[in-house]
């Protein structure tokens, strides 16, 4: 019978969050050695060694995916996993949960404001989670950091999830939320009606689709912040095959999402409602794009950024060469991830404020 590695035993006894914070304080070389000792089987020389350790531990625990067929269980598991790594939240002057009475139905949202007495621009944020998991709580720390360091209000939207809801229904709610914020800009103290859309992964997909749908409307998004968004269910690019295993997002995950979100709702894989890379790219607002090198979505996002430039859209594309999909969620336990999130927040605001 094989013995449990001491680190695995420590993580099991102390909990994932405590164990991850302990790993975060180890030197990079020690993290590399630990990942090797835990038999991490993949060769990704430039990947953050802290992430390698986390992935090695996940594999040792028999977890190769963060979602699975049992959607109800996947939701509970994801919430528990995110709760386990949460630390003390970044302080903010105002954080409140509010109800949005939309045309498509009432939903919850979380409003973050770093200076409630001031008028500030707003970012509408749509959380990631493969369209089927995730919540206001799972992305709370990211939204706090974004509000503080971009000096903006953030409205995080609790949109309905698949498979219970179709892409059309989900997108409609997300677009209605943007329209609601615009209609209530005076009450919300939104500076000069400046409202951007943002999201990570599946949320980045929704932000992209909403931005496309809002072009020419009174509530059109003024900017986009897209963090490793899902943009193309139809095509497979080199990064898909290079990084399809042993990381946060796997080929297995993408195939499951494709089936539950797209195919089960009788959508074509290249329908712009689910694959916005095939949508109308004219007159889109300035777009700040984030990719992680070790992400199977890397190439499709890079291609989209290139397409936007070809259509005259002002684009800034930042690639984090040592990161993988989902790294913004590691900010509570990773000094490097937190540094990157703060950098993204500050640089996005500078980009947004810059004149053409």
Q: What label would you give each PLM region?
A:
Residues 1-111, 353-356:
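A glycine/proline-hinged amphipathic helix-loop "lid/cap" segment
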Residues 6-24, 42, 94-356:
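Alpha/beta-hydrolase superfamily serine-hydrolase fold, recognizing
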